[in-house]
């Protein structure tokens, strides 16, 4: 089993998750892809009830980040493109995550972030470690961050990926209203922690 990642600065995600005590609450990743971020979190945090991976797969067309523009496409699809997030990728990831699933450490919510946030099964949980690596538009990440902030445990950490593709300062500022502060930034990742 070789679970790979396609991003940068995974060493920061590992550092921020290392020995972080979830105190019996959930951890979550929006945008699982091949599962490397989720694996790093599960291998490093302590005392999480379960890790939830959220990803719809299925080659959906959507705008991935604020500054995407695809010339020549109809207005409806401008800024959108189908990524290689196929159902086959999902099936491979689930096989690779078999040990974690078998031990009750991982479950996949095979749906969009919007569906996840509206789903009653996930709406009333408390989350202690969150990794936002799905849609990278400011408005989407802001919506996710506020949703998780409203369901956060004391000292929850929210890690945001691909910060160079969105207005991260806006998101960090809004999270101050939920008592989150930035504890460290890399070139493409930021970690915020609830006071």
PLM regions with names:
Residues 3-195:
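S-adenosylmethionine/decaboxylated-SAM
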């Amino acid at each position: 089993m070789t679970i790979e990642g396609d991003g940068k600065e995974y060493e920061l995600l590992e550092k921020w998750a290392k020995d972080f005590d979830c105190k019996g609450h959930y951890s979550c990743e929006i945008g699982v892809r091949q599962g490397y971020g989720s694996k790093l979190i599960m291998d490093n945090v302590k005392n999480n009830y379960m890790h939830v991976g959220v990803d719809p797969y299925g080659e959906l067309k959507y705008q991935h980040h604020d500054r995407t523009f695809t010339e020549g496409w109809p207005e409806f699809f401008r800024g959108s493109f189908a990524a290689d997030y196929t159902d086959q990728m999902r099936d491979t990831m689930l096989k690779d995550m078999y040990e974690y699933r078998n031990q009750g450490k991982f479950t996949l919510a095979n749906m969009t972030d919007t569906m996840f946030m509206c789903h009653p099964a996930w709406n009333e949980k408390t989350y202690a470690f969150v990794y936002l690596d799905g849609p990278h538009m400011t408005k989407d990440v802001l919506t996710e961050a506020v949703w998780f902030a409203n369901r956060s445990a004391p000292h929850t950490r929210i890690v945001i990926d691909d910060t160079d593709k969105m207005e991260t300062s806006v998101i960090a500022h809004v999270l101050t209203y939920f008592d989150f502060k930035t504890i460290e930034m890399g070139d493409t990742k930021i970690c915020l922690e609830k006071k």
